[in-house]
Curated annotation (Swiss-Prot):
Native organism: Mus musculus (Mouse)
Pro residues bias: start-end ranges: 213-222, 539-553
Protein name in the entry: Forkhead box protein O6
Entry-annotated residues carrying Phosphoserine: 184
CDD domains: FH_FOXO6
Recorded GO CC terms: cytoplasm; nucleoplasm; nucleus
Post-translational modification: Phosphorylation of Ser-184 is be important in regulating the transacriptional activity.
Transmembrane among keywords: no
Region described as Disordered: 1-77, 163-183, 197-232, 534-559
UniProt lineage: Eukaryota, Metazoa, Chordata, Craniata, Vertebrata
Function summary: Transcriptional activator.
Annotated GO MF terms: DNA-binding transcription factor activity, RNA polymerase II-specific; sequence-specific DNA binding
Tissue specificity statement from the Swiss-Prot or TrEMBL entry: Expressed in brain in areas of the nucleus accumbens, cingulate cortex, parts of the amygdala and in the hippocampus.
Length: 559
């Protein structure tokens, strides 16, 4: 049996002796420090293998016995092979340059001399001296000379010669120098250490709070950020400013020129938003006409929106103090009942409403909640934009209108438009025509100021700006209009159960109707360049009973 095994056994090459390894088959193989330990490990491995193997493996075990002495020689070779760092050895470029400079008699070399030393004394660069294959390693040498502080450059005395490279006598650092950054509160090493200690102390002293205890708008407590730890840091204000202004929707503020005329505290109040979700309230606005600030008692739109019930609800929850504040908002002039007329068509462009009210609030800028116009015909902004003395009563749903017995003739307190129209003579006043069959006031509104929506479409009556005209009793509205307009306007104003247009409904006004017509004509009609009363769009077709040619379409523009 043993003779058969010897006959099939192959002679083992001493250079490729079999290596024993543990049964776990780990890689790389463990390298024993001592030959004795390796012999013991080999013996243990062979003995362990012989216990598990059959008689054939036991017979081959003596043949593998001479391997341990060879394994002792292989161990150190592998260890040296794995420690190689670069293709030419374990030295770096900086080490090679240092050796080249130290080998020179003057301890200095030019760049070309360093190249020559590399090709001559380093075996790896012997065949890489030509220009095609030397671009890479020569570039690396130049970089190392520039980056390391151990090398210094000395200007050559001769003209047209390259500089000398020498070793730094002070002994510079090896390796690349880190990039320098400007020291600040955020990246300085000293401040970073202080910041870390301060944050730990602050976290230890902070009481634990649950998210349920915090108010609704407060942030949830969590780990302190860098901006929260250092409030004085310049970078810490960016997130705070963003959170403070993230919900601010617009930039509708008073002009800086107007705010500069106020006191310092008033200017700050005028420039600050009333809330993050709305524009500044009318209380902080400036009156363009009188140059005075609006009273602070005016209600804000957010407070008016709820009790007024914009979606068709009632006004049962409207506080009495709100009505009293609106009546007293304009001081003794409003209580005396002497509202003056100011007629700027810009008011109709800013949401309808109008132009008949105190001049302090006529040209207010466009207020928020303007999008209600898209859903409701008679918008809340139209009624609340100028904030006249009769604005809040005008917002209330009117009582059911009683049938009127006759046309609008001889009623006390009629519009004094006749005096205003007398300054601009037109066609002669036509005699009053008999009333046509009653038409709906909503179908043919005659409005001095164009409203975007029909009056009363949402249950809110538009403001009675026409009622601000005071005049002598007994004046006729139809006499105030030019001839064709007076004849055509007689139809919709006839008697019937329908309501009058909001511009002509005198029941909506509860104040006095006194006014100086001459001051109106001199101050407002003459000075205004944008006055344009256009009745073409509001005229109904002439009644069939009227004789004569139809009136021509024309616009009445004062000169």
């Amino acid at each position: 049996m043993a003779a058969k095994l010897r006959a099939h056994q192959v002679d083992v090459d001493p250079d490729f002796a079999p290596q024993s390894r543990p049964r776990s088959c780990t890689w790389p193989l463990p390298q024993p420090d001592l030959a004795g330990d390796e012999d013991g490990a080999l013996g243990a491995g062979v003995a362990e293998g012989s216990e598990d193997c059959g008689p054939e493996r036991r017979a081959t075990a003596p043949a593998m016995a001479p391997a341990p002495p060879l394994g002792a020689e292989v161990g150190p070779l592998r260890k040296a092979k794995s420690s190689r760092r670069n293709a030419w050895g374990n030295l770096s470029y900086a080490d090679l340059i240092t050796k080249a400079i130290e080998s020179a008699p003057d301890k200095r070399l030019t760049l070309s001399q360093i190249y020559d030393w590399m090709v001559r004394y380093v075996p790896y660069f012997k065949d890489k001296g030509d220009s095609n294959s030397s671009a890479g390693w020569k570039n690396s040498i130049r970089h190392n000379l520039s980056l390391h502080t151990r090398f210094i450059r000395v200007q050559n005395e001769g003209t047209g010669k390259s500089s000398w490279w020498m070793l730094n006598p002070e002994g510079g650092k090896t390796g690349k120098t880190p990039r320098r950054r400007a020291v600040s509160m955020d990246n300085g090493a000293k401040f970073l250490r202080i910041k870390g200690k301060a944050s730990k102390k602050k976290q230890l002293h902070l009481p634990e709070r649950s998210p349920d205890d915090s108010p609704p708008g407060a942030p949830v407590p969590g780990p302190l950020s860098a901006s929260a730890k250092w409030a004085a840091s310049p970078a810490s204000h960016a997130s705070d400013d963003y959170e403070a202004w993230a919900d601010f929707r617009g930039s509708r503020r008073p002009l800086l020129g107007e705010a500069a005329e106020l006191e310092d505290d008033e200017a700050l109040e005028a420039l600050a938003p009333s809330s993050p979700l709305m524009y500044p309230s009318p209380a902080s606005a400036l009156s363009p006409a009188l140059g005075a600030r609006c009273p602070g008692e005016l209600p804000r739109l957010a407070e008016l929106g709820g009790p007024l019930g914009l979606h068709g609800g009632g006004v049962a929850g409207l506080p009495d103090a709100l009505l009293d504040g609106a009546q007293d908002a304009y001081g003794p002039r409003a209580r005396a009942g002497t509202p003056s007329y100011f007629g700027s068509c810009k008011a109709s462009a800013y949401g309808g409403g109008g132009g008949f009210g105190p001049p302090a609030l006529g040209s207010l800028r466009r207020l928020p909640m303007q999008t209600i116009q898209e859903n409701k015909q008679a918008s809340f902004v139209q009624a609340a934009a100028p904030f006249r003395p009769g604005a809040l009563p005008a917002l209330l749903p009117p009582p059911p209108p009683a049938p009127r017995p006759g046309p609008l003739l001889g009623a006390p307190g009629e519009l004094a438009l006749a005096g205003a129209a007398a300054a601009y003579p037109g066609k002669g006043a036509a005699p009053y025509a008999p009333p046509a069959p009653s038409r709906s006031a909503l179908a043919h509104p005659i409005s001095l100021m164009t409203l975007p929506g029909e009056a009363g479409a949402a249950g809110l009556a538009p403001p009675a700006h026409a009622a601000a005209f005071g005049g002598p009793p007994g004046g006729l509205l139809l006499d105030a209009l030019p001839g064709p307009y007076a004849a055509a306007a007689a139809g919709p104003l006839g008697a019937g159960p329908d309501r009058f247009p909001a511009d002509l409904d005198l029941d909506m006004f509860s104040g006095s109707l006194e006014c100086d017509v001459e001051s109106i004509i001199l101050n407002d009609f003459m000075d205004s360049d944008e006055m344009d009363f256009n009745f073409d769009s509001a005229l109904p077709p002439p009644p069939p009973g009227l004789a004569g040619a139809p009136p021509p379409n024309q616009s009445w523009v004062p000169g």
